[in-house]
Amino acid sequence: TMLGSRRAVGRCEGEGGRMDKNNVVVVSAVRTPYGRFGGTLKDIPSIELGAMVIREVLRRVNVKGEEVEETYYGSAVPGEVGLETDVPARQATLKAEMPADHVSITLDRACCSSLSAVRLGYRAIKAGEVEVALGVGAENMSRTPLIVPPYVRWGSRLGNIELWDGLYGLGYKGFNPVSVDAGEVALEYGITREDQDRWAYGSQMKYSKAFTEGKF
């Protein structure tokens, strides 16, 4: 998702309009298709998927990489990106042919990572620090590796060696997965399944409308 101040993006859509020039607007937004676990996308690194959408989101509005001041990149499965790099934001922007001196930040906020990336871009623009930013989110759970315990590096003299599945419980140790906490919060605040279904339905209808209008 590319965000920009009203002043910065005026040239993309023509000057004028009723919006205040201090407003932050979404200029361009794209996404890759979904794939099933172990499906057609299982061998494609998430960094490649991230680079793909960065290139396309810029192409659609004819914006050059050097015009983007910061990229915020959300990724919630560090075990998968770790197969390629510990700094996915940097790698994805370079693969998307952004300038080598481009500023980027990687963040992990579990399921909210990509929306948090968009939010940080919004905040930076609103604070007057930048005028154009990218909010990106990419991961490929199908490529998450099985983990060898740390002691294996220094040798195992006796007994079996286990492999850990980083996706099982998404690696949560000592506290509940987010899905369990979400269920408990719903009970605490009296949010029924019907309430949640209505919210999900409304979200799907908004996407359907946006897709029909060519926004995605």
Question: What are the language-model segments listed below?
Answer:
Residues 30-33, 74-79, 109-113, 137-144, ...:
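Acidic, glycine-rich active-site loops and adjacent beta-strand->loop/helix elements
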Residues 108-139, 186-215:
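Active-site-proximal alpha-helical scaffold in enzymes
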Residues 126, 131-185:
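Flexible glycine-/small-residue-enriched beta->alpha junction loops
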Residues 19-44, 56, 187:
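Condensing-enzyme catalytic core mediating Claisen C-C bond formation in acyl metabolism
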Residues 47-62, 88-92, 117-120, 178-185, ...:
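Short, well-ordered amphipathic alpha-helical segments that serve as non-catalytic structural scaffolds
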Residues 1-18:
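Short, Lys/Arg-enriched N-terminal segments with co-localized hydrophobic residues
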Residues 31-32, 43-52, 60, 195-216:
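N-terminal extracellular/periplasmic Venus flytrap/periplasmic-binding protein-like
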Residues 71, 75-132, 172-178:
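Conserved catalytic cysteine-centered active-site region
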